Amino acid sequence: MAQISLESIKKIEKYRNTVHKKVHTTYTTFEMDGEKYVQIDTYGHIDRENPEKISQPFQFDRATAEFLVKLLSEEFDLR
């Protein structure tokens, strides 16, 4: 499992984009070493061999959450 590196994240231009299918998603919160984390888990498509297995986990600490809130607010013009 990996966490987002805020030191190296950057915007890139991609010319071939697709919208992915929606999949089952869950989230959990936990604390480790005094720091709170939110983990979002996505699961495979129903036709996968093991659809109950986590496909992609994403972990966010406070700094990452602040970065993503700012990014999404700017990109979607949220107020």
Residue ranges and their predicted role:
Residues 3, 39, 56-59:
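Residue-identity detector for glutamine
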Residues 6, 30, 58-59, 65:
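Mobile acidic interaction elements
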Residues 9-12, 45, 63-65:
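Generic structural motif
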Residues 21-54:
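A short, structured beta-strand/loop element
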Residues 59-79:
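Mixed-charge, Lys/Arg-enriched low-complexity segments
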Residues 8-11, 26, 57:
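Residue-level preference for alpha-helix termini and adjacent loops
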Residues 1-21:
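Negatively charged, low-complexity tracts enriched in Asp/Glu with abundant Ser/Thr
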